[in-house]
Curated annotation (Swiss-Prot):
Quaternary structure annotation from Swiss-Prot or TrEMBL: Part of the 50S ribosomal subunit. Contacts protein L29, and trigger factor when it is bound to the ribosome.
Gene, per the UniProt record: rplW
MF-aspect GO terms: rRNA binding; structural constituent of ribosome
Protein name in UniProt: Large ribosomal subunit protein uL23
Pfam families from the UniProt entry: Ribosomal_L23 (PF00276)
UniProt similarity note: Belongs to the universal ribosomal protein uL23 family.
């Protein structure tokens, strides 16, 4: 698996935005990725030092649309904590 394929997208929620003040960034990652791969991918993509990686699996939810029923996709989230001397990740860059 390539390092660029590990990180899918940042998770943008109120809780994840508040965690950014403590240098904790939440990403949706590939379901096959482990902590070591996530750490290498974040360090190479954003040029930062990673202190800790926590991973959690999000189970699929049952959804119904009229008579059709199914499940959402299972996901995997990674909460990446940066070191104190590391620079911040700019997820939202202002276009000038």
């Amino acid at each position: 698996m390539e390092l660029l394929d590990v990180i899918k997208r940042p998770v943008i929620t109120e809780k994840s935005m508040l965690a950014m003040d403590e240098k904790k960034y939440t990403f949706e990652v590939d379901t096959r990725a482990n902590k070591t791969l996530v750490k290498q991918a974040v360090e190479s993509a954003f040029d930062v030092k990673v202190a800790n990686v926590n991973i959690l699996n999000v189970r699929p939810k049952f959804k119904r649309m009229g008579k059709y029923a199914g499940y959402t996709k299972k996901r995997r989230k990674a909460i990446v904590t940066l070191t104190e001397d590391s620079k911040e990740i700019q997820l939202f860059e202002a276009a000038e």
